[in-house]
Amino acid sequence: MEPIKNMPRLCRTLGYEFNDQSLLEHALTHRSASSKHNERLEFLGDSILSIIISDALFHQFPKATEGDLSRMRATLVCGKMLAEIGFEFKLGDYLNLGPGELKSGGFRRESIIADAVEAIIGAVYIDSGVEKCRCLVLSWYESRLAIIQPVNQKDPKTLLQELLQGFKKPLPVYKVIDIKGEAHAQTFTVECYVEELSKPVIGIASSRRKAEQLAAADALELMKR
């Protein structure tokens, strides 16, 4: 695995200095670049992020229902939001990608950026424990937590379905067109077919659910144009 450049600058951007910098390098390494890739860290970070955001919402909204809390959490931890955070950090400049992913523009792909954010969260947890990880994640989410409310927090698939129903159009159809990797570290490619769009919209992520949500989010953006 090749060293990743400008680590000090990235650490300043993240707001965290790693005790073991190899953890950060590991978190930024895509499966296309090395057998020692970031998918296990991503798995860990996904779970930790969910706990941190769940806890924050639980205390911030003492009167919110379980459904409201779940929808707000889904909004805050979805691939679209994680990619937004990753782009703010300019993570694409630091990713370790294989030649094929570099050529296809993987450093701009939302799913790869989102997965790297989760992997960094997992790396911080291993490096410093849950409390420092919690403080860091909450600093990333401070402005987002400040504006979120327990209303209209619907995931992209639900919003797309409701939009099409409002126009009395057929519901979207999701189809898995490719699954790569071993059972514990798979990448799913999903096509979303919407009658109003000239061609299917594609979502790529580490689970079918995430890939469908990414495809639905992109379909929504296209429908708004």
UniProtKB/Swiss-Prot annotation:
Pfam families in the record: dsrm, Ribonucleas_3_3
MF terms in GO: double-stranded RNA binding; metal ion binding; ribonuclease III activity; rRNA binding
GO terms for biological process, alphabetical: mRNA processing; regulation of gene expression; rRNA processing; tRNA processing
Cross-referenced InterPro entries: dsRBD_dom, RNase_III, RNase_III_dom, RNase_III_sf
Domain RNase III: 7-129
Record-annotated active site: D46, E118
Required co-factors: Mg(2+)
Reactions performed catalytically: Endonucleolytic cleavage to 5'-phosphomonoester
Principal subcellular localization: cytoplasm
Keywords of the record: Cytoplasm, Endonuclease, Hydrolase, Magnesium, Metal-binding, mRNA processing, Nuclease, RNA-binding, rRNA processing, rRNA-binding, tRNA processing
Compartments reported by the entry: Cytoplasm
The protein's Enzyme Commission number: 3.1.26.3
Domain DRBM per the UniProt entry, residue ranges: 155-225
GO terms for cellular component: cytoplasm
Residues the record lists as binding Mg(2+): E42, D115, E118
Family label: Belongs to the ribonuclease III family.
Subunit structure: Homodimer.
Its biological purpose: Digests double-stranded RNA. Involved in the processing of primary rRNA transcript to yield the immediate precursors to the large and small rRNAs (23S and 16S). Processes some mRNAs, and tRNAs when they are encoded in the rRNA operon. Processes pre-crRNA and tracrRNA of type II CRISPR loci if present in the organism.
Protein name (Swiss-Prot/TrEMBL): Ribonuclease 3
